[in-house]
C-alpha cells in the first residue's frame, strides 16, 4: 500500500509532499479517525527503555525536522513511535531559505535539504504541544533565528528553553544544522563552552521554578574530525549534558557523487549518511564510556542498520528519511525487533 502512496507523493515537489503529509496526519490524528489510524498502522508497544530518567515505551523515535511546528503529533504517535521530537523551532517565526530547498536522491534513498529552520516560532509550537492528545515522550528541538548573530546565539536558545521547559519531556540544542550560516561554529571551543554553561545554569533555575528536571540533549554534526569529536565529548561530560544526538545531516557528497541533485547545497540525510553517523556514534561511545547516553540518528532504514547503531553505542534511535522511503511499516519492524 505504501508503494502507491510513495509514488503519488514522489510525483510532487519534495516540500509539497512533506506539507501534504503533515496536513493529512494533522487531520487524521486529531479526529475520530485516530483510532482507525492506530489500527491501520498496528504497531506493537515494543521494548521499554529508561534513558535520561525518562521512560520510553520503545527506543524508536521520530527525528526533528519532520514536524517542525508540532502540528501532527497525534498522527505520528499513531505510527507507534516510542518518542517524538518536534522542531527545530526558533524564538520568532522565520521563512527559512528560498524555495526550492528540498531535493530527493531516489537512487541513493537520500534527501538534501537547505530549509534554514523554517518554522512558525516557539509560541506557535507550544500552543500545539499544549493541545496535543499525546502521552508519550516529547522532545522539543530548539535553534537560533537566522538574523541572530552566532555571538548572540545563546540568547535565542535561552528564550526557547524558557518557553519549552514546562511542556517538554526533554529539550535538544541544535547546533549542527548546515543550513543556518555559522551555526556549526557553536560546536567548538569557547563558543560551545559558553553556550552549555548558560544552558545548564538556566536549566537549574527552571528546575527549581517548575519543580521538575527536564533533560537537555545536544545534537551534533557528522562532519567532525577525530579531534573535534574528542573535544566535544569532553565538553559534554564537563557540563554534565543529559544526552547527545548523533548525527545531523552531512555536507559531504562522497556517497552520492554524480547522482541527480547531488550538487544541491544543503544537508544530506537518508541512506548515504548511514555509515558516517554510525562511525561518529562509535567514536563518541569510546570517549563517553556510557556517562552520557547517545541517541543515534542518520540513515536508519532497516532492522540491520538500526542494530549496527545500537551495537556502536546508541541507546535510542531516531529516523525520518527512512520513513519517507519505506513508510510506517518500517517503524513496526524496528519496534518489534530493536531492544
Swiss-Prot record:
Its cofactor is FMN. Pathway: Pyrimidine metabolism; UMP biosynthesis via de novo pathway; orotate from (S)-dihydroorotate (quinone route): step 1/1. FMN binds at residues 64-68, 88, 141, 174, 219, 247, 270, 299, 320-321. The active site is at residue 177. Substrate binds at residues 68, 113-117, 174, 179, 248-249. InterPro entries: Aldolase_TIM, DHO_dehydrogenase, Dihydroorotate_DH_1_2, Dihydroorotate_DH_2, Dihydroorotate_DH_cat, Dihydroorotate_DH_CS. It is found in: Cell membrane. Keywords: Cell membrane, Flavoprotein, FMN, Membrane, Oxidoreductase, Pyrimidine biosynthesis. It catalyses: (S)-dihydroorotate + a quinone = orotate + a quinol. Transmembrane segments: none annotated. Pfam families: DHO_dh. It comes from the Bacteria. It is a peripheral membrane protein. Belongs to the dihydroorotate dehydrogenase family. Type 2 subfamily. Monomer. This is Dihydroorotate dehydrogenase (quinone).
Amino acid at each position: 500500500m505504501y508503494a502507491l502512496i510513495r509514488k503519488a507523493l514522489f510525483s510532487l515537489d519534495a516540500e509539497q509532499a512533506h506539507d501534504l503529509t503533515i496536513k493529512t496526519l494533522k487531520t487524521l490524528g486529531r479526529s475520530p479517525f485516530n483510532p482507525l489510524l492506530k489500527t491501520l498502522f498496528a504497531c506493537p508497544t515494543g521494548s521499554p527503555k529508561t534513558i535520561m530518567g525518562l521512560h520510553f515505551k520503545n527506543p524508536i523515535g521520530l527525528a526533528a525536522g519532520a514536524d517542525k511546528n508540532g502540528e501532527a503529533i497525534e498522527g505520528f504517535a499513531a505510527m507507534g513511535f516510542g518518542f517524538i521530537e518536534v522542531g527545530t523551532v526558533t524564538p520568532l517565526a522565520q521563512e527559512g531559505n528560498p524555495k526550492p530547498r528540498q531535493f530527493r536522491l531516489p537512487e541513493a534513498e537520500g534527501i538534501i535539504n537547505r530549509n534554514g529552520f523554517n518554522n512558525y516560532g516557539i509560541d506557535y509550537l507550544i500552543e500545539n504541544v499544549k493541545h496535543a492528545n499525546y502521552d508519550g515522550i516529547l522532545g522539543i528541538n530548539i535553534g537560533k533565528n537566522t538574523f541572530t548573530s552566532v555571538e548572540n546565539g545563546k540568547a535565542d536558545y535561552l528564550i526557547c528553553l524558557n518557553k519549552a521547559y514546562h511542556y517538554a519531556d526533554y529539550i535538544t540544542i541544535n547546533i549542527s544544522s548546515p543550513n543556518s550560516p555559522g551555526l556549526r561554529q557553536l560546536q567548538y571551543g569557547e563558543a560551545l563552552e559558553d553556550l552549555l554553561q548558560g544552558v545548564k545554569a538556566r536549566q537549574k533555575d527552571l528546575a527549581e521554578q517548575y519543580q521538575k528536571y527536564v533533560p537537555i540533549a545536544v545534537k551534533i554534526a557528522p562532519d567532525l574530525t577525530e579531534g573535534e569529536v574528542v573535544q566535544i565529548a569532553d565538553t559534554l561530560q564537563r557540563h554534565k549534558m543529559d544526552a547527545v544526538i548523533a548525527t545531523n545531516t552531512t555536507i559531504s557528497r562522497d556517497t552520492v557523487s554524480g547522482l541527480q541533485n547531488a550538487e544541491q547545497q544543503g544537508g544530506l540525510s537518508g541512506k548515504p549518511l548511514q555509515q558516517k553517523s554510525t562511525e561518529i556514534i562509535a567514536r563518541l561511545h569510546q570517549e563517553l564510556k556510557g556517562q552520557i547516553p547517545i541517541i543515534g540518528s542518520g540513515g536508519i532504514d532497516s532492522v540491520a542498520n538500526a542494530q549496527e547503531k545500537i551495537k556502536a553505542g546508541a541507546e535510542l534511535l531516531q529516523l525520518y528519511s527512512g520513513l519517507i522511503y519505506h513508510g510506517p511499516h518500517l517503524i513496526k519492524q524496528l519496534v518489534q525487533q530493536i531492544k
